[in-house]
Swiss-Prot record:
Organism this protein belongs to: Gluconacetobacter polyoxogenes (Acetobacter polyoxogenes)
Cofactor(s) it depends on: heme c
Gene that encodes the chain: adhB
Pfam families per record: Cytochrom_C
GO CC terms, sorted: plasma membrane
Cytochrome c domain segment(s): 31-134, 178-293, 317-407
Reaction equation(s) it catalyzes: ethanol + a ubiquinone = a ubiquinol + acetaldehyde
InterPro entries: Cyt_c-like_dom, Cyt_c-like_dom_sf, Cytochrome_c-type_DH, Membr-bd_ADH_cyt_c
Coiled-coil residues: none
Binding residue positions for heme c 2: 193, 196-197
GO MF annotations, alphabetized: electron transfer activity; heme binding; iron ion binding; oxidoreductase activity, acting on CH-OH group of donors
Name of this protein: Alcohol dehydrogenase (quinone), cytochrome c subunit
Amino acid sequence: MINRLKVTFSAAAFSLLAGTALAQTPDADSALVQKGAYVARLGDCVACHTALHGQSYAGGLEIKSPIGTIYSTNITPDPTYGIGRYTFAEFDEAVRHGIRKDGSTLYPAMPYPSFSRMTKEDMQALYAYFMHGVKPVAQPDKQPDISWPLSMRWPLGIWRMMFSPSPKDFTPAPGTDPEIARGDYLVTGPGHCGACHTPRGFAMQEKALDAAGGPDFLSGGAPIDNWVAPSLRNDPVVGLGRWSEDDIYTFLKSGRIDHSAVFGGMGDVVAWSTQYFTDDDLHAIAKYLKSLPPVPPSQGNYTYDPSTANMLASGNTASVPGADTYVKECAICHRNDGGGVARMFPPLAGNPVVVTENPTSLVNVIAHGGVLPPSNWAPSAVAMPGYSKSLSAQQIADVVNFIRTSWGNKAPGTVTAADVTKLRDTGAPVSSSGWNSVSSGWSVFLPQPYGSGWTFAPQTHTGQDAAQ
């Protein structure tokens, strides 16, 4: 599932959206169109409905799923190839019900189970934006590359009836703090955070769509494009337990804080979506996430162990697999103490991505590198190089295991050279137990918008959805 797997507008940027030229007609309600542009930001619609180097919302993004390849659709108001002839009822039916204009069910790469709780008011604004604020693009949709019989759509209708709730405007429980209620709506509705951060069941459905659905909600997802979305619950080891509300606010606004930095698929979310949220909405999300208890049993607390830093500083690394590689390739940025450099190179000591059960993200970023994208609030891009060509599979496995067990990190399992080879050569994720397996969920391939490489060159982001 996609999601991009995806949750401030400044006054100047409020009416802008991702590379679109506003095409308002005289009868369009300007305020409603502007509100719809913001709702589209909340849902990060542009991330999935725009192909790499393609025109905004014209579709064509390749999405790898367990049953084959599908392509996002053209949702510009073009009357022939887009949604220009959709009535509001038909638009609402597609977004919140998962049913397209011809009556067939959409592939659940479209997160309509989350969108089902969006308010009718937000839906009307979103419709106004797509009809009057988006430039029409006459680009036909690409047909899915799925073999028969998996290409038949009628089973999707059964899936929808089993796992997608009937659309209903979000209503908070009586007595809920209004700020938490707003955060709940943003996270579980348009933001569809659970599409990536919630584990999936036997039919690839999210195991819980909100906190009422149980402790699986936002407890960490399956690999998507070989990035594992971590837990957003308040576990102090693998979740947000050591994060403050202000940490969450700043992370979503800029993509970086003193003890963490965005990478992988979340880089797209910050670049195209959350950096444009209002401050009030970002604070609401932060307050809501901090209200979620850890999944029992909690893994306790993280305690830093200085013995690794002392060993590295002494130079006695030859007898410790991975330590010598760490000193030569990693310590210059992430330091001997595993503390990194604030707002540039994230710490490895106690990092939830490092100690989480599934090591796929760590293996992937070491093998292929990653990008910390620029934002309006932190306009410098930083990239980590990939080591798949300069280090052997065994060297990568050793340094991964070293990082996961140093500075007080107590990550489970052991990564092998075979795991690294499989991920590097075929794209298969690493399982939690240290052996190769197929991802349980949607495997989505969405390239980083800012490319790759090793760069500290200052960049600016103008609020338009195009790398500057």
